[in-house]
Swiss-Prot record:
Its EC number is 5.4.2.-. It is an enzyme of class 5 (isomerase). The record marks H150 as: Transition state stabilizer. HAMAP family: PGAM_GpmB (MF_01040). CDD domains: HP_PGM_like. GO terms for molecular function: phosphatase activity; phosphoglycerate mutase activity. This is Probable phosphoglycerate mutase GpmB. Pathway: Carbohydrate degradation; glycolysis; pyruvate from D-glyceraldehyde 3-phosphate: step 3/5. The active site is at H9, E82. Keywords: Glycolysis, Isomerase.
Length: 215
């Protein structure tokens, strides 16, 4: 059985400022760097053999910190990028017009082929995330990879593994530097294919995540 760990990047400056990131980027805060070190301490005990990350800066930095703890190299895979939020990227969430908020809601509420202008649909996101995950099946026997990605992207992946629509990711709370795990199994009695073992574990973090403080 292949075990794959899924980690959301550490807190960023734009997370703190409530700006829409998408495939734009901002650096980790000092708290985000600390979160990544704490993931590294947990990952050191898990026997991680490969660290594969979105090629955006915030995930790369998170992956580099984890890799230092695990003694692994980092492999970049653009398929693990966040949802492309088009013309709304870099915008403060509270600055959106009614029309712009409508675009965002169409996307996250599951309107068929809903997308922000110049952005990506949830279906497109789901397809590339599943392709990236499937690549883990090609790793040598005994591998235990850890993927570093983004909140909406990972939520979409976990939701669709569970048989839910991609937009159900809004019902999952995957905080910064949370750890999830999915397993690939073949069984005559249980579900074959990908199954979700854990989602959104933050027991390794020693301080509340920002979205806990903003509730």
């Amino acid at each position: 059985m292949l075990q794959v760990y899924l980690v959301r990047h550490g807190e960023t400056q734009w997370n703190a400022e409530r700006r829409i990131q998408g495939q734009s980027d901002s650096p980790l805060t000092a708290h985000g760097e600390r979160q990544a070190w704490q993931v590294g301490e947990r990952a050191r005990t898990l026997g991680i053999t490969h660290i594969i990350t979105s090629d955006l800066g915030r995930t790369r930095r998170t992956a580099e910190i984890i890799a230092e703890a695990c003694g692994c190299s980092v492999i970049a895979d653009a398929r693990l990028r966040e949802l492309d939020m088009g013309v709304l990227e870099k915008r403060h969430i509270d600055s959106l017009s009614d029309e712009e908020e409508g675009w965002r809601r169409q996307l996250v509420n599951g309107t068929p082929d809903g997308r922000i202008p110049q952005g990506e649909s949830m279906q497109e996101l789901s397809e590339r995330m599943h392709a990236a995950l499937a690549s883990c099946l090609e790793l040598p026997a005994g591998s235990r990879p850890l993927l570093v990605s983004h909140g909406i992207a990972l939520g979409c992946l976990v939701s669709t593994i569970l048989g839910l629509p991609a937009y159900a990711e809004r019902r999952l709370r995957l905080r910064n530097c949370s750890i999830s795990r999915v397993d690939y199994q073949q069984s005559p009695w249980l579900a074959s294919g990908w199954v979700v073992e854990t989602a959104g574990d933050v027991s390794h973090l020693d301080a509340p995540a920002m979205d806990e403080l903003q509730r």
